[in-house]
Amino acid sequence: MKHRTRTPSETHGAFPRVPSPQSPVPDVESRVPAVPVVLTIAGSDSGGGAGIQADLKTFMARGVHGTSAITAVTAQNTRGVSSVHVLPAREVRAQIEAVFADFPVAAVKTGMLASAPVIRAVARALRRHPALPVVVDPVLIATSGARLLAADALRVLIDELLPLATVLTPNLPEAAALTGTDARDPRNLQRVIEKLMALGPRAVLLKGGHARGRAVRDRFDDADGSLEFVHARRAGEAHGTGCTLAAALAAELAKGRSPRRAATLAVAYVQRALARGHALRRGGLLLLRH
C-alpha cells in the first residue's frame, strides 16, 4: 500500500500563512481611527457627579480618550463636601509627566487645583507644550458652598495659569473674584468680560447660571466678538455642570474645532445632559446623565 503524506490542513488545520518579504505586511494601526487624547487636571468627587469623574464621563460621551492627573481627593456627595485632601505638587507633576510621556495629548482641561504649589506645577508643565489648547475652569467654590481653592492661591492662578488659557470658563461668582467687579449685575457685564480677557485667555465663556431671571444666559467672547447662548432655567440645582461644560469644550478643541465652535457644541451637550438628568441621591442636587 502506497503511503501518502498528509498536508497540514488534513491534520490540525492549515498553518498560518507567513507573508513573504515581497508581500506587504498588514498595518493594523493604520486601520484604527485615531482618537484624540485629552488630559484633565482636577480633583476627584466621591459622589461621581463632578470633578475628574464628570470629566472622564464627558470625554467618553464626546468620543475622546480621557487621561487624568488628580490634584485633590474630596469626600463629597450632592449634600456637600465633608473632606478635602490636597495632593503634594510633586505627585500632581508626576501624573502629568506620566501622561505626556506616553500619550499624544491634544488638549488639556484644568479644574480644581486647590493650592498655589499645585497651580505652579501645572503652569510649569503646560508651558512645555505651548501649542496645546487649554481650558481653564477656575474652580473656587463647590456648588454646595465649600471652598475648593486656598485663599492665597487666587493670585497665583491669575498670574501663572490664566495667560496660558485658550478658553476661560468662570461662573459669575468666580468672575467677580477674578475681576473684583460684581458680575451678577447685568450693567457690569461688558466690563467684567473686558477684565477677564485682559487676564490673558484667548477666549472667555462666562456661565450665567447664578444670575436671576427665568432664562440663563451664557456668553462667549473672543477677538472676533460675542456669542450668547440662552436657555430656560431648570428647577433646582444641578451638580457638575461647570466641570462637564469645560470637559466637553476641551474634547471638541482636541478634535480641532475652533474655540467658538467648541463652546457652541459644549453648551448644547450640557443642556442635553441636564434634560436627561436623574435623581440618584438623597441630597438636593440633580446629577447629569452623560
Predicted regions and their residues:
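Nucleotide and nucleotide-moiety/phosphate-recognizing core
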Residues: A106, A116-A131, R191, R202, ...
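Phosphate-handling active-site elements
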Residues: R62-T67, L227, E252-A266
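Short pre-catalytic strand/loop immediately N-terminal to key active-site residues, enriched for Gly-Thr
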Residues: I41-G47, S226-H239
